[in-house]
Amino acid sequence: METPIIPSSSSLDRSGNSSNLLSVIPFQERTDSIIGCHFTLEIKAYHPDMMKSSEEGDVTLGSLYQGIHHIIRNKECQGLILGMDATHENKLHILALAFLCVIRKYEGKVSTYIERSKDTFSGVEQLLARIHIGDDHLGTYDPEVYQICGVEVPQGTYQLTLRTVLTPHNHTDGLSITLGIIVNSPARGMQGRSPMGVDVKRLILSFPKGTDPWTSYGEIKDKKGAVSKLKSILF
């Protein structure tokens, strides 16, 4: 895990002068936001091979991103909910942004809270891997604070839930994924807390070959309940 990036002040620093920012982001392109995130990532494996891979930690966030990217690109997303505004493009942007934070936090592994069980009705055995970062009092503070390098996030609270099923090649039933996200911009209650730095360009290079995420970063813009159309994000 890298050393957290320390902001030059408690407010959003958009000057690009902080010596702590990673040099991979060119000076003229730096637009940094300090956001707070709550995550719930739940992965259920049904196929024996996928259950074994989950137990051994072989299922990575990168491989999940590859499957999610494929589904989004083919417009097969189900269960997307966004609180701030309802445009499809903005949902994908927030999903990708939050997923970068998840990858940054867990460095690819999802083998947390592993439990085998049987479905109450069908009797089918399944394996549950669940990651949760959060608190019951979500309006009080953000349990994880991130400094996002290169992507500006307008002020507001974004709520997103993605539920989908990924079916691996030659498997009749594979992984069921629920990704629940709350993003607060700016982060709340962060006095004395150092945000973790999320270097968008570095993380994009770590994604599996062929996913081609964020070929253009685009922007998120407030426009009275709508946002400008994003440019090639996740497509």
Curated annotation (Swiss-Prot):
One Pfam assignment: VMR2
More info: Most abundant protein in the virion.
Keyword Translocase part of the UniProt annotation: no
Membrane association type: Peripheral membrane protein
Protein name: Matrix protein
Subunit annotation: Homomultimer. Interacts with nucleoprotein and with the cytoplasmic domain of glycoprotein.
InterPro entries documented for this protein: Viral_M (IPR031454)
GO molecular function: structural constituent of virion
GO cellular component: host cell endomembrane system; membrane; viral envelope; virion membrane
Location, primary (coarse class): virion
Keyword Membrane set for record: yes
Source species, domain of life: Viruses
Source species: Taro vein chlorosis virus
Cellular localization per UniProt: Virion membrane; Host endomembrane system
Keywords: Apoptosis, Host membrane, Membrane, Viral envelope protein, Viral matrix protein, Virion
Function field: Plays a major role in assembly and budding of virion. Completely covers the ribonucleoprotein coil and keep it in condensed bullet-shaped form. Inhibits viral transcription and stimulates replication.
Protein family: Belongs to the nucleorhabdovirus type-2 matrix protein family.
